[in-house]
Amino acid sequence: MKRLVKSLRELQAAGRWDIDFHLPPEGIKSFPADTLCRVDEVADVAKDKRDPTRLPDVPFQYLDISSVDVATGSVANPQDLEGAEAPSRARKVVRAFDILISTCRPTRGAIAVVPRKYHDQIASTGFSVVRAHDDVNPFYLHFALRLPSTLEQFRKWSTGSSYPAILDEDVAKTLIPVPSAEEQDRIALLVVLALDARDQAIRKANYAWNRTLGEITSRLSGSAVMPDAMEKAESGSVPITTADIQETIRSLPELTIDGRNTSTEAQAVLI
């Protein structure tokens, strides 16, 4: 049986009486203590906002929870909307290489890095937007935020039964392992290359599957099987090291935030 002694004042200050909240997380203990940092020591929780409805005819891309592929932690299929169509939750302005963390049911791991092409676009207020410090690799930070030890802490901070949720403050106090800058870059490279290899394998498998179905259909209909070239993988150059990422960020336009850069001509540059 787990036992923990807390004073009434401590319980009242935390606003939580459940033992799971107050017990120290277990998973994070597997990492060296001298590498552990709070998220707010290596990143900021961004609060930039813009109301798209103020420019009803201006198009934008909306990143909501359904835009995140939980399996890979990548952004997939954001919505193309005009300002007049913006839902009330479409308010958070995101910068390239920001990290989106779904605050509703956070243990699902709906956590993604914002690609360059969605710089200055709009995300749901259902995300906590984490912006890595200049000396921290966003791809490494994304990896660390999806670790089981991180999701365990998100579970501890969660409130609510049907739709457990966390706050920006909970994200900020979460502990993650943070190695040297050089090691961060190495890990980021491994993760990005592994994800690219996974994507290529899926594309090849889908191609083989569709080609086989096409051949079977052609045989049944008596028509000749037409050869076709396999679709090539997209080959954009994605900056991975912290230095390259910072250089890319400096080349991007400023974010369009309410009260700053709000002219109707202010549009995000898609790269």
Could you describe each region identified by the protein language model?
Residues 38-46, 74, 127-178, 182, ...:
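Basic, amphipathic alpha-helical recognition segments used for DNA target recognition
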Residues 98-100:
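Beta-sheet entry/capping signal
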Residues 88-89, 117, 161:
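A structural connector/turn signal
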Residues 53-61, 92-94, 112-125:
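Short, surface-exposed loop/turn microsegments at beta-strand edges and helix-strand junctions
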Residues 52-61, 156-158, 227-228:
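Short coil/turn segments at secondary-structure boundaries
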Residues 37-52, 66-96:
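Sequence-specific dsDNA recognition surfaces
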Residues 102-146:
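A short beta-sheet element
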Residues 1-53, 177-271:
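Non-catalytic DNA-recognition/assembly elements of restriction-modification systems
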